């Protein structure tokens, strides 16, 4: 099977790290071992600096980051990662497993922030063209459950400290986007871990069978 780009998405506390391991195990059981792992924002020297700038609550002192400036920083980090890491890895025949990609911006900034969706789509198309993940696993969790898990991990970053209404809007946009795109598969991440693991493995296996057909 040719190389593919698989992305794991979801709110804070959805279980993306655990899901990544399950995806890896499922791929390995199918004989796929050459994988590259990415995260957004981040994954290159420049992108990691932008990550610190946009997520660290201390990064800009008392200066509030403008919503549109936030979007542009996310896209700057994303383009750098796609062009210098993801595309070259795919060209080498490696599989890429990503923690977040463009769906996060469409959900968090388009849903949570309320930024004009046409503008976001235009910007995405301008800088990414038709580049898209082959498969996106969206781990659906309520903000209440997700933030409770996130708080248990420790200090929250700048976006994790947003209001419950922000995360409700973000989740609603995630669900809307997932319903409209067959390359996005939704997993109920509020279930017990063994049930989530079962669903992730089944989703990956089904998708791989579809690709082989």
Curated annotation (Swiss-Prot):
Gene Ontology MF, one: dTMP kinase activity
Keyword Signal: no
Binding site for ATP: 10-17
Enzyme Commission code(s) on record: 2.7.4.9
Top-level taxon of origin: Bacteria
InterPro entries referenced in this protein's UniProt entry, alphabetically: P-loop_NTPase (IPR027417), Thymidylate_kin-like_dom (IPR039430), Thymidylate_kin_CS (IPR018095), Thymidylate_kinase (IPR018094)
SUPFAM superfamilies hit by this protein: P-loop containing nucleoside triphosphate hydrolases
Pfam short name (any one): Thymidylate_kin
Entry keyword annotation includes ATP-binding: yes
Reactions the enzyme catalyzes: dTMP + ATP = dTDP + ADP
GO cellular component: cytosol
CDD domains given in the database record: TMPK (cd01672)
Enzyme class, broadest EC rank: transferase
Key words, A-Z: ATP-binding, Kinase, Nucleotide biosynthesis, Nucleotide-binding, Transferase
Biological-process GO terms, alphabetical: dTDP biosynthetic process; dTTP biosynthetic process; dUDP biosynthetic process
NCBIfam families, per the entry: DTMP_kinase
Family, per entry: Belongs to the thymidylate kinase family.
Function: Phosphorylation of dTMP to form dTDP in both de novo and salvage pathways of dTTP synthesis.
Protein name: Thymidylate kinase
Source organism of this protein record: Klebsiella pneumoniae subsp. pneumoniae (strain ATCC 700721 / MGH 78578)
């Amino acid at each position: 099977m040719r190389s593919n780009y698989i992305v794991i998405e979801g709110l804070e506390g959805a279980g993306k790290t655990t899901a990544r391991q399950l995806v890896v195990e499922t791929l390995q059981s199918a004989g796929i071992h050459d994988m590259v792992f990415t995260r957004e924002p981040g994954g290159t020297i420049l992108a990691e600096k932008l990550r610190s700038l946009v997520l660290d609550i201390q990064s800009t002192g008392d200066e509030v980051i403008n919503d549109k400036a936030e979007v542009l920083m996310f896209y700057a980090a994303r383009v750098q990662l796609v062009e210098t890491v993801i595309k070259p890895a795919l060209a080498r025949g490696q599989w890429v497993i990503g923690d977040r990609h463009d769906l996060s911006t469409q959900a968090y900034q388009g849903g949570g922030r309320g930024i004009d969706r046409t503008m976001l789509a235009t910007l995405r198309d301008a800088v990414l063209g038709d580049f898209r993940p082959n498969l996106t696993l969206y781990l659906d969790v309520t903000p209440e459950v997700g933030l409770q898990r996130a708080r248990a991990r420790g200090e929250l970053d700048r976006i994790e400290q947003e209001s419950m209404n922000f995360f409700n809007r973000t989740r609603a946009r995630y669900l809307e986007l997932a319903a409209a795109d067959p390359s996005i598969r939704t997993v109920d991440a509020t279930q017990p871990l063994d049930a989530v693991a079962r669903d992730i493995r089944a989703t990956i296996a089904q998708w791989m069978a579809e690709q082989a057909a």
